Amino acid sequence: MAMWMQVVIIPFLVSFTCVWLIHPAIAKMAIIRGLTDNPNARKLQKSPVPVMGGMAVFFGIIVSAGVTSIVFNSYALFTCVVTMTVMMYMGFIDDLVGIKPWIRIAIEVAVIGFVVIMDLVNINDFHGLFGIGKLPVYVSLPLCAFSGVGIINAINMIDGVDGLSSGLGIFISFVFGCVFFYSHDFTMAVMAFATMGALVPFFFKNVFGHLSKMFIGDSGTMMMGIILCIFCMRTIDNTSRVSRAYPDLGVIAFCLAALSIPVFDTVRVMLLRIYHGRSPFIADKTHLHHVFIRLGFSHIGTTVCINILEFINVLSFFLTYWLGASVTLQFIVVVLTSCTTTIGMYFFLSYLDKHHRTNRLITTVSVYSQRFVQQRFYKAMTRLMDKGM
């Protein structure tokens, strides 16, 4: 069997099929048990929505990983499954009763430590960024913990409108999956495409479903966060197959580009909260997706626009790499592009909203995104997604 079938197609199809089949049953159970996210002044939904989407995604990834582990016997798959399970259950408890921020952070640090010990990967090499190579242990371990906690919570905090976190998760998993595949890191490629396959059916049901709509919840975003954290650690580690296959590729710049929208938007939001004397962990409506909604965009319009911004950041990185830029220049370009598409875009859109200014392009896209949800295609997709409910 061709390697691309084993690494790409089979993991994707197995996880996709599992989530598609089990999603209605989990949604029904959540409704019966009252496991729903209820609307309030901060949230954007107008009615209670089941919050167990992360369970469906988890099931798809686990089954896919189990099937492919027959071919790829790797500690990395075991590590991914264990850490996903811990983070999924922690997020589920947080969805139900809430967990104090410091307890969540402590668990996240412990899980990241488990990854470092079991999988022997770490953020221990800058690969020439600013002339820095291998890092001593007393620097790499705290950096790994800090970065990992940041990635997990960035994915969690970006989850604000239908399809946004899952849409970004699909794109980011695809990008990592392609890089892992062409670097011959097939174990991580399997996890990336299994994650992508599990998120695709959830995305469609989350965006188009009515009766079948579920939120991914903290259980799903925490699980996605640790998977993406492992992808980054695997890419940056000094034994990375990616850096061996592509020695001129800035692996830190690549990871930052792949996670640019969640990371840079979260950093901006937390700094603004601290500046205004508020706790960085108390949710508000200052994320990039909130300003799109205030300007009249639909949820799907907001999701599409933010994914386009993410695509621009990743494309700018690869263009810089293909043009032969140094590792440091690749990093600088990613930072500048990401700041423009997140911080710059937020303040530009906020200015339009605050001063009631109009922009022809923004207005056109906003109006079309609202009309889209009234078109026949959207309604047909809703009927398809709600089958079995």
Language-model features: locations:
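Alpha-helical transmembrane segments
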Residues: 2-29, 33-34, 58-74, 78-89, ...
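Juxtamembrane helix-capping/reentrant segments at transmembrane boundaries
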Residues: 38-52, 213
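Membrane-embedded alpha-helical core segments of multi-pass
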Residues: 82-90, 107-122, 143-153, 169-175, ...
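Short aromatic-rich membrane-water interface segments that cap or initiate transmembrane helices
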Residues: 44-50, 130-141, 251-255
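Membrane interface segments of multi-pass transport proteins and intramembrane proteases
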Residues: 97, 125-135, 297, 318, ...
